[in-house]
């Protein structure tokens, strides 16, 4: 199996998880800065936003994870900030998205940027970053699904790493990574089509696409908190889908400008 630690520098462990997150972030920032001028947004605003939003999102993702694992962390408070022993592995993407959205609201108000324009730029970048970041779960041997008889359709390096606790496991990380990659490609193609998508609909596409995929894939997992018959992440996914649909209906009704004239 793959060692979750990529580099050991004395007492400091640099995990593949962190490398995947940073790689996804760098690519996301590059793509967003390249697209920003098309929406009359200064590329430096993208960088300034990331410098604030990224650490806040990490904290939000960590707090979200801790909140739903409080039975453990309530008895081991020091583990909440125990990043030097792999604490960064315990984060949840929805917590990061919520924290990032809060930062986005205040950032756009301060810089006098239309939040919808910023979201349209950010959506494909977030999607590709998530696609790459999921491979960190693979290296950590986490976020996997239920036991299956075999995974013969997968390459051996994935199959071997999905043999956990005496059984092969559904590689849900891979399903979500591929799903996000497909969504990213679709957004890049569709946003170049003239008079197809209206302002805000790229962000709406992300919410619907990611929400739908996450809701299905989350049902394959065995390590998620349940609430009222569904996993918490599935409820949040449903919210994303309905918000995305609502944005499209609203933007079409008010005849918002096209993203690409």
Swiss-Prot record:
Record's keyword annotation contains Lipid biosynthesis: no
One Pfam family it belongs to: LGT
Record field: transmembrane: 12-32, 41-61, 87-107, 112-132, 170-190, 200-220, 229-249
Subcellular location: Cell membrane
GO cellular component, one term: plasma membrane
Membrane topology: Multi-pass membrane protein
Pathway: Protein modification; lipoprotein biosynthesis (diacylglyceryl transfer)
UniProt entry keywords in alphabetical sequence: Cell membrane, Membrane, Transferase, Transmembrane, Transmembrane helix
Keyword hit for Ligase: no
Binding, a 1,2-diacyl-sn-glycero-3-phospho-(1'-sn-glycerol): 134
The protein's role, per its UniProt record: Catalyzes the transfer of the diacylglyceryl group from phosphatidylglycerol to the sulfhydryl group of the N-terminal cysteine of a prolipoprotein, the first step in the formation of mature lipoproteins.
PANTHER family (alphabetical): PHOSPHATIDYLGLYCEROL--PROLIPOPROTEIN DIACYLGLYCERYL TRANSFERASE, PROLIPOPROTEIN DIACYLGLYCERYL TRANSFERASE
Similarity comment text for this entry: Belongs to the Lgt family.
Protein name according to UniProt: Phosphatidylglycerol--prolipoprotein diacylglyceryl transferase
Native source species: Streptococcus sanguinis (strain SK36)
Gene: lgt
